[in-house]
A protein has these predicted regions:
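Active-site mouth loops of central-metabolism enzymes
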Residues: 24-35, 93-107, 188-201, 269-275
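Hydrophobic faces of well-ordered beta-strands that scaffold small-molecule active sites
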Residues: 25-32, 43-47, 70-78, 123-127, ...
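Second-shell residues forming the walls of enzyme active-site clefts
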Residues: 53-65, 80-82, 147-318
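Surface-exposed, active-site-proximal loop segments in enzymatic domains
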Residues: 85-98, 134-145, 184-190
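Glycine-rich, aromatic-flanked loop segments that form ligand/cofactor-binding clefts
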Residues: 62-89, 105-132, 152-179
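Short, well-ordered alpha-helical
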Residues: 6, 10-82, 128-143
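Loop/turn elements at helix/coil->beta-strand transitions in domains of secreted/extracellular proteins
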Residues: 20-26, 40-44, 66-71, 117-122, ...
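Preference for extracellular/luminal or secreted protein segments
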Residues: 1-42, 244, 253, 274-407
């Protein structure tokens, strides 16, 4: 069922009494970098990957310093273990697809919801619903379920159901779709090169199905879509995060999305490299966005927004509307979720191992040399470069891959 933010009279009264600084704290999602001082007034907060105990402690500390309810979020695109060191480490969305078991993708979502909420999280930036249209894409790779739109939809939808059925808010990313370019949004504004028909039949189809099935949040990527947009005064196509034609005309009006639109990180060059940082921030709201990711409500930030309001580039009505939507979203979640889902943790590791086992397969064996059998012993140095959070997962894959060779 399509998600529509519920009206809330008490929230409206609260918003109408807020000053600009208070309103801005409702429509940013700062990340914790060094101190916690500038996030204690915010209503939403991103916590970077860390250990289970450290993340739980941070959330508890911030909550104790705050006078209002908050939602905490992190990146869990394929299970909680990708962000929380100590949680079950599932492989990837690509592995979920290759395993060929839709229920395993659902159970991965269930496991993520339980383990994330146990730490104190309410929300995740996932699943990634990008299509792997270009194998040289630096952003997509195994974050994408497949090159095929139907497989992307099938397995990411199952993961989303698992997340939201057990109380963790899911977020689709990265609208209007990554995976067809060789450029990285962290470094520049990338481009989705598809024609209108190609986009409608692929990403448009995926987002339409998710909207009909209750997705609550969509992340606007720093990706342009020339097929549905026009060049700016400099002859450049803007990223979706700063485009009214893409966020309002396409996503809201054509596709009918009425949930929350959050930007990808504002510190990425695809956003702040396209135009002045503060101008980009107000342009996001004017384009139809609701919440700025990694924006911090500092004194300078507030002063800049005051300047734009005074000049007429931004209005208080827009800020109030976005604050109202975000607080309604928060209150609705808090009212619905009170208890943790059933503890099935002893089975989470089993689900993850099953996904690893099923996803390891032979794609190409032209000369029929697998499994490799050698007459003489051969010493091979197998070096894996990975962060410490991935060590246990790499060991699982290495063990499974050994079935294809005995050397």
């Amino acid at each position: 069922m399509k998600y529509i933010i519920k009206e809330n009279k008490m929230v409206l009264e609260k918003v109408n009494k807020m000053n600009l600084e208070e309103l801005l704290n409702c429509i940013v999602c700062p990340n914790i970098v060094a101190t916690q001082e500038d996030v204690t007034k915010a209503y939403f907060c991103f916590i970077h990957p860390n250990t289970y105990d450290n993340m739980k402690r941070k959330i508890e500390n911030i909550t104790s310093l705050n006078q209002h309810k908050m939602l905490f979020v992190t990146d869990m695109e394929a299970g909680a273990g990708s962000a929380i060191d100590g949680a079950t480490r599932f492989p990837s969305m690509r592995a979920a697809c290759e395993a060929g078991d839709e229920n395993l993708a659902y159970l991965m979502g269930k496991a993520a919801a339980y383990e994330a909420r146990k730490v104190g999280f309410h929300w995740t930036f996932g699943p990634c619903v990008d299509i792997l249209g270009n194998h040289f894409s630096p952003m997509t790779s195994i974050r994408s379920a497949s090159e095929n739109k139907d497989d992307v939809l099938k397995y990411t939808a199952a993961y989303m159901r698992g997340l939201q059925d057990f109380g963790l808010i899911a977020t689709l990313k990265h609208f209007p779709g990554d995976g067809y370019t060789m450029f990285d949004q962290h470094l520049t504004t990338s481009c989705n090169p598809l024609t209108k028909k190609q986009w409608d039949d692929s990403y448009g189809y995926i987002y339409q199905q998710f909207i009909h099935n209750g997705v609550k949040v969509i992340m606007a990527g720093h990706i342009s879509l020339p097929a549905y947009d026009e060049k700016d005064s400099n002859g450049i196509y803007p990223p979706a995060s700063l485009s009214y034609p893409l966020l309002t005309n396409l996503l809201k009006e054509k596709l009918g999305f009425e949930g929350i639109i959050i930007s990808d990180a504002t510190e990425m060059s695809g956003f702040c490299g396209y135009m002045n940082y503060y101008e980009a921030c107000f342009a996001f709201f004017n384009a139809g966005g609701d919440c700025l990711l990694f924006a911090h409500p500092t004194e300078e930030f507030v002063d800049k927004m005051k300047e734009y309001i005074a000049s007429g580039k931004l209005t208080m009505e827009v800020i109030q509307n976005r604050a109202y939507r975000m607080l309604c979203f928060l209150e609705e979640y808090v009212a619905q979720v009170n208890t943790l889902p059933e503890n099935d943790k002893e089975n989470f590791e089993i689900y993850a191992n099953q996904m690893v086992d099923l996803s390891c397969k032979i794609y190409r064996d032209r000369n029929h040399i697998l499994p490799i059998q050698l007459d003489k012993p051969l010493k091979i140095a197998h070096v894996v470069i990975a962060c410490q959070y991935d060590f246990s997962l790499i060991e699982k894959f290495t063990k499974q891959l050994s079935s294809f060779a005995s050397v």
